Amino acid sequence: MRFPGFEGEWETKKLEEIADKVNSGKTPLGGEDVYTKKGVLFIRSQNVNNDRLELNNSVFIPESVNNQMKNSIVRSNDILLNITGASLGRSCVVPEDFKIGNVNQHVCIIRLKQNYNSRFIQPIFSSYKGQNIFNSLQTGSGREGLNFESIKGIKLSIPQKNEQQKIADFLSLIDERITTQNKIIEELEQLIKGLCQKLFHNRNNKDWSEQSLEDVLEERKELNTDNYTVHSVSVSKGVINQIEYLGRSFAAKDTKNYNVVHYGDIVYTKSPTGEFPYGIIKQSFIKERVAVSPLYGVFKVKNFYMANILHFYFSNPINVQNYLQSIIQKGAKNTISITNQSFLKKRLYLPIDEKEIKKISSLLSAIESKKTVEMNILERLKNQKKHFLQQMFI
């Protein structure tokens, strides 16, 4: 697949032939103790994500430390490649307006020669072909790292400079649209978060009162004797078919002791994950009955719309932590100990007027529906880019 107007064979080159620099940084002497609130940006592997340089949770080093690490100073248009750990193979191009930064030993700097376009080369790294190359080059007993010699030896098919630019421009356009979509989704998430914050902390509202969860929820004690399909619960997808979400079933052969979930029920996982060290709390929007792990708490609702409000409230990890941390005991291997009865005993500030309950639920659900539409657009853009990369870099 090629754009119209371009002819001639692509050349095969080793990366070392088209790069002026292939090396990484190091941990500064003194490690994290030398990090400062201001100074020179110090890039770590977590900053190289989603084909871009993400500067959330950035750390900095003093100018004096940066001067001791001159060989790993980062410039605009450098390619950054993660070369160790779980994020191995992730890469990005340093933005045009980037000022100055440095990297640690887990991030490789690839600085290309003048006739080669980093915004053409980096998408090859992100493509299916590129990821396969990195997987094949991993070294060590656990196959967990890339060395510089193997990176330099990577062979790439490359067109002339003007065709590189054409492809890079097209991919940059898709990336800009992906970035815009991500911002739209983030704004909708912040809107839900802000509304919940405002509503749940307005103690002057006479239509709200402090209630325990057992006033609005009741433990559902129904076992899976009818062998319903086993589902999991995730932060982003909520209650979802286990095979669809995880690729295979992790359920026991006999699931008759699993808990049954009805449409509208609240499910509490009681297991730590990511930003939710005390577990996830989600409402099920699956019309049919499903089964979940016997470790999960399942609660039937006295009012669907109230449970829906709780679903949105507990989508914020801070709210989950504030509600659960005083009633949970953590055991060995980070296990969580809490009874379903204890879960229901704590109190929250909740609406009491039926019309307001439904109104709040409808508002939050409308924003969530808009977010779902925008996420589908984002998924289509990502698939478009993936398809183009597969066709271009077979």
What spans do the regions from the language model cover?
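Glutamine-centric residue-chemistry signal
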Residues: 46, 105, 122, 131, ...
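A short glycine-rich beta-alpha junction/loop motif
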Residues: 100-108, 139-162, 289-295, 328-355
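A short beta-sheet element
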Residues: 44-45, 56-128, 259-319, 339-340
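PDZ domains - specifically the beta-sandwich core and the conserved carboxylate-binding loop
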Residues: 35-36, 77
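Non-catalytic DNA-recognition/assembly elements of restriction-modification systems
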Residues: 2-26, 153, 157, 201-224
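A structural feature that tracks compact, well-ordered secondary-structure segments
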Residues: 1-9, 13, 155-202, 347-381, ...
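Sequence-specific dsDNA recognition surfaces
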Residues: 16-31, 46-76, 214-228, 234-266
